[in-house]
C-alpha cells in the first residue's frame, strides 16, 4: 500500500486499538524523577545515572527514551546504559515455550535458593548471552553455606559487644604473618572489587571475592 490509499475504498485504515507502548515508557526517567510533580527531585535526579535493559530493545526503548529526552529537555536521559544478554538453554539455544526448554524460576529458587541463583546471574558479563547452568548454582549455594558458617564461627569468637571489642583492639599491633597476609589481601580485594563495580564489571568483582574467600578457608 501507499499513503494515497489510506482511508479510501480498496485501501487501508489504521487500527484504532493499537497503542505505541514506547510513548509512555520512553518517559520513564522523567516520570520516575518527578517531572511536572516534584521539581526539586527532578532537578537533583535527572538525568539518571543508569538504565539497565536488554540488548533486544535498543532500537525501541533506548532510542525512544533518548529522543524524548533530547526533544523535551535537550539532555540525555541517563549517563550509563547496562545492556544484558539473553538467558539461553544449556545448549545455548533461545528459550521458548514451543520448544519446551523454558525454566520456571520458582522451581529453581526452591531447589537452590536465591543466593545461589544470584551467584549464577552475577557471573554473566554485560552484553553477553548466558547459558542456563545449574552447575554454577551448585557452586554458588556451596559458597553461600560456607559464608554463613564462617560468619557464625567468627561472631562466636570472644566478646560480641562492640565496645568491648573496640577497647581490646586499641593499640594492638598484628604480628602474626597469617593475619597480616589476610589484611593485605583484603585491602587489595576491596580496591579491585570497587574498581570493578565502578566499571559495572560485577562478574569480575564476584570472581575475586570468591577467590579471596576460598584462599583463606
Where are these regions (language model features)?
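Intrinsic disorder/low-complexity segments
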Residues: 162-174
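S-adenosyl-L-methionine
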Residues: 159-162, 178
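Aromatic-rich surface patch/π-platform used for binding flat ligands and interfaces
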Residues: 175, 179, 183
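Structured secondary-structure scaffolds
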Residues: 1-158, 182-217
Amino acid at each position: 500500500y501507499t499513503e494515497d490509499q489510506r482511508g479510501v475504498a480498496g485501501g487501508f485504515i489504521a487500527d484504532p486499538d493499537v497503542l505505541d507502548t514506547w510513548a509512555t515508557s520512553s518517559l520513564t526517567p522523567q516520570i520516575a524523577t518527578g517531572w511536572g510533580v516534584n521539581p526539586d527531585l527532578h532537578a537533583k535526579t535527572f538525568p539518571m545515572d543508569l538504565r539497565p535493559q536488554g540488548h533486544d530493545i535498543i532500537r525501541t526503548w533506548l532510542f525512544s527514551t533518548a529522543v524524548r529526552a533530547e526533544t523535551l529537555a535537550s539532555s540525555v536521559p541517563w549517563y550509563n546504559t547496562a545492556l544484558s544478554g539473553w538467558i539461553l538453554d544449556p545448549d545455548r539455544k533461545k528459550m521458548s515455550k514451543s520448544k519446551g526448554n523454558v525454566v520456571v524460576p520458582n522451581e529453581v529458587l526452591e531447589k537452590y535458593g536465591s543466593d545461589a541463583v544470584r551467584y549464577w546471574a552475577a557471573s554473566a558479563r554485560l552484553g553477553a548471552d548466558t547459558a542456563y547452568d545449574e552447575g554454577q548454582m551448585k557452586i554458588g549455594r556451596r559458597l553461600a553455606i560456607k559464608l554463613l558458617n564462617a560468619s557464625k564461627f567468627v561472631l562466636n569468637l570472644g566478646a560480641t559487644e562492640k565496645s568491648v571489642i573496640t577497647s581490646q583492639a586499641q593499640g594492638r599491633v598484628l604480628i602474626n604473618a597469617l593475619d597480616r597476609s589476610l589484611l593485605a589481601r583484603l585491602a587489595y580485594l576491596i580496591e579491585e572489587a570497587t574498581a570493578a563495580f565502578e566499571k559495572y564489571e560485577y562478574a569480575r568483582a564476584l570472581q575475586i571475592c570468591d577467590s579471596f574467600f576460598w584462599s583463606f578457608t
